[in-house]
Each structure stands twice: as structure tokens, then as C-alpha cells.
Regions:
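Acidic, glycine-rich active-site loops and adjacent beta-strand->loop/helix elements
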Residues: 87, 168, 198-199, 221
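Active-site entrance/lid segments in N-terminal catalytic domains of soluble metabolic enzymes
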Residues: 2-192
Length: 272
């Protein structure tokens, strides 16, 4: 059985983390996810200018606190902020200070494993949740990885949990089978794991759990919601598309990822 930090056990209804969607995720979506039993998340960099992140974190924490007061028997799930920890992110220090101010329960790190970032998040609860997992409200770090090598590096640097980004995940993703990734990771890691990759139904969530994941990491399905910051035409495209409409390529950004053919055409390019 996985060792799950107490903060992640606050999920009210579903073993689901709503993945942070570039541009699209916003406070309204995060609040809706959390108040309906899903760990909601958004990228810190979606707040533009940087000062807007303070306003957004205030909005989220106040809304969730109000919900919990009004619904003591149905508390909100925790929320998460995604931080790009690569050295190219010149906002990281500023954004991390704001996350510390609001004691963001979960930090999702991407593009590099940073021991200093992990230690800072753990300090919000006053103790490392890796050592004492019963801490009621300590910061937890989940790190997204595309293979077992990076998974080891993330845990060695102090991350608490892993997000294997398997084949089929929206945006930048691995081509590895989720069966292989989960099996390799579970051979040595018993902490929280959230599986990403083509999960958009209750059956897929159950399958992820059967493989050994604690949570399903779902992004694309939340694009087609009222709260998502996307145009209606794109939301409809999400609903109308199927697996044959997905292109896996490194042509557009230099990094392999999954893209919708319709989006590629709308950008004036030929997906074929």
C-alpha cells in the first residue's frame, strides 16, 4: 500500500488530480475542481503579470475556506500550483514566495528536480512530510517525469511523489507505456503516484489504480468545462476529436508532445 501524505488524503470524492493547463487553468476552474472532490491545479505562470498570482491565490484560498465553512461534512480537496523549476524561469523565486505566503498544499514541479525548492515547500508545514506523513497541512511536492531515471532523480532530490507522464498525455509527453512506467516505479517507490496519459473516464481511473497509481492525472477533459479559460470552438474540438486526431511530434517545439490536428490546422500548418 502506498504511503500517502495526509494533505493528499483530503480528496473528498475522486482519486483525481486536475493537471495544470497552460493558459487554460484559472482560479474558477481550480475552485470548481476542489469543491467537487478533485485536487485542482494551475501553473503559476498562467498569472500574468506576476503580481496577479497573489490575487489568484487569495481568491482560491478564500473560496475554499468559505466552502468548507458552509459544508463541514463535504470539505474541499487541496489545490496545487505548478512551478517550472528550470533556470530559465526568472519568476520562480517570486512565485515560490507567494506560494509560501498562502501555504499552498501541493506544489507540482516540472523541468528539473530542485532540492532547494522541495525543502522550501516542506518548511511550510514546519517538518518534512517525507519523514512524518501524518502532518495535517504540510507542503507536498509532486514531480512529473517521463521515465524511471528522472523518477529516481526527483525522489533523491526530495520530492514526495511522482507523476509519470505516459503515452497519450496531452502536450509534452513520453511515448512509454503506462504499464511499463508504473511497474518500474513501483519496484522501488511506495509514495504517492499520479498517472498521466489518455485518462478521461471512470474506467480509466480505475485502470490506473489497478496498475498501482494512487491518482489519475487528468487535463484535457477539463478543457471542455464552463470554467476553463478556452474559447468555445476549442472546447468543442476537444469533445469532437478522437485518438486519430492526435499528432505526436517534436516539430512544433523541439520536444515530443501530443497535439490536436485541428489546432495545428488553425495555426496555419498541415498536421500531415
Amino acid at each position: 500500500m502506498s504511503k500517502i501524505p495526509a494533505v493528499l488524503q483530503r480528496v473528498a470524492k475522486f482519486p483525481v488530480i486536475g493537471s495544470p493547463l497552460f493558459i487554460i487553468s484559472n482560479p474558477k476552474l481550480v475552485i470548481a475542481q476542489c469543491t467537487n472532490g478533485v485536487i485542482g491545479s494551475m501553473p503559476a505562470l498562467n498569472a500574468r503579470p506576476a503580481s496577479q498570482l497573489d490575487e489568484w491565490l487569495h481568491e482560491i484560498t478564500e473560496a475554499l475556506a468559505a466552502h468548507d465553512r458552509a459544508n463541514p461534512g463535504n470539505p474541499s480537496a487541496p489545490f496545487a500550483i505548478n512551478q517550472i523549476v528550470h533556470k530559465s524561469n526568472d519568476r520562480l523565486d517570486h512565485d515560490m514566495q507567494l506560494c509560501a505566503k498562502y501555504k499552498v498544499p501541493v506544489i507540482i514541479t516540472s523541468l528539473g528536480a530542485r532540492e532547494d525548492v522541495n525543502q522550501a515547500v516542506h518548511a511550510w508545514g514546519g517538518v518534512s512530510v517525507r519523514e512524518i506523513r501524518s502532518v495535517p497541512w504540510g507542503g507536498v511536492v509532486m514531480h512529473d517525469v517521463i521515465n524511471n531515471v528522472f523518477a529516481h532523480k526527483a525522489i533523491d532530490k526530495g520530492a514526495d511523489g511522482l507523476i509519470p507522464v505516459a503515452a497519450g498525455a496531452g502536450g509534452h509527453a513520453s511515448a512509454k507505456s503506462p504499464f511499463a512506467m508504473i511497474q518500474e516505479i513501483r519496484q522501488w517507490f511506495d509514495g504517492p503516484v499520479a498517472l498521466s496519459g489518455a485518462i478521461a473516464s471512470g474506467g480509466a481511473i480505475l485502470a490506473a489504480q489497478a496498475m498501482g497509481a494512487d491518482f489519475a492525472y487528468i487535463g484535457s477533459a477539463f478543457i471542455a468545462t464552463h470554467e476553463a479559460r478556452a474559447v468555445d470552438a476549442y472546447k468543442q474540438m476537444i469533445c469532437d476529436s478522437n485518438s486519430d486526431d492526435i499528432v505526436y511530434s517534436n516539430f512544433y517545439t523541439g520536444v515530443l508532445g501530443n497535439y490536436l490536428k485541428g489546432s495545428i490546422r488553425n495555426a496555419g500548418m498541415d498536421p500531415d
